[in-house]
Amino acid sequence: MAAGYPNIDIAPFIDHALLTPTATPEQVDQWCEQADRYNFASVCLYPTYVKQAAEFLHGKKPKVCTVIGFPTGATTRSVKLYEALEAVENGATELDVVINLGCLKSGNTEAVHREIAEICEETGQVVKVILETNLLTDAEKKIAADIAMDAGATFLKTNTGWNGGATVADVKLLKDITRERVGIKASGGIRTLNQALDLILAGATRLGTSRGIDLIHQRDNPEKVE
């Protein structure tokens, strides 16, 4: 473990993400094998690979997570719902859903709520609502968080990673807002063990990162952690 930090097993916090546009079926199998080997919480993939991941991880501990309306959140409500339902049919048990940022910023909170609530109610799965905190004011973060919780979200997720990464300040803010009523997933730019531990200590209960293996290596070789 990194010097100066409590002894935290980070592996069960990690959503092992493979969200590059060039992801291949071979990489999907590799990510699934790694998620199983290291006891990660889930493997997080594009919807096109959900069925493959679900077959690989059948009977194993890691969950199959996918992204909905990713990365902009600007698809229509009906398209997001269809995407979510199809993902569940193919084996996904966790859905990371990007909110409609335009509706949020224009004050159309009813549309934001309806979209999230429909997905939560009709899929019955774990829903992590992506707020894209780097594009929101603190006041907007609170509005978005309150909407997501009221609509039935299981987690609030900080970022897609396409517009900047998670910050300790945002995780602390979300923890204050949620008061542990839902989980908090920090995502985007998590590359070092110290970063991961800082986010966990700030209140993150999941970490979305493509660098899960690097984090494990840093955990197991603390003398190499800066």
UniProtKB/Swiss-Prot annotation:
It comes from the Bacteria. Pathway: Carbohydrate degradation; 2-deoxy-D-ribose 1-phosphate degradation; D-glyceraldehyde 3-phosphate and acetaldehyde from 2-deoxy-alpha-D-ribose 1-phosphate: step 2/2. The active site is at 96 (proton donor/acceptor), 157 (schiff-base intermediate with acetaldehyde), 185 (proton donor/acceptor). GO terms for biological process: 2-deoxyribose 1-phosphate catabolic process; carbohydrate catabolic process; deoxyribonucleotide catabolic process. Its EC number is 4.1.2.4. Keywords: Cytoplasm, Lyase, Schiff base. The keyword Cell inner membrane does not apply. CDD domains: DeoC (cd00959). It catalyses: 2-deoxy-D-ribose 5-phosphate = D-glyceraldehyde 3-phosphate + acetaldehyde. Its main location: cytoplasm. The keyword Cytoplasm applies. GO terms for molecular function: deoxyribose-phosphate aldolase activity. GO terms for cellular component: cytoplasm. Catalyzes a reversible aldol reaction between acetaldehyde and D-glyceraldehyde 3-phosphate to generate 2-deoxy-D-ribose 5-phosphate. Belongs to the DeoC/FbaB aldolase family. DeoC type 1 subfamily. This is Deoxyribose-phosphate aldolase. It comes from Nostoc sp. (strain PCC 7120 / SAG 25.82 / UTEX 2576).
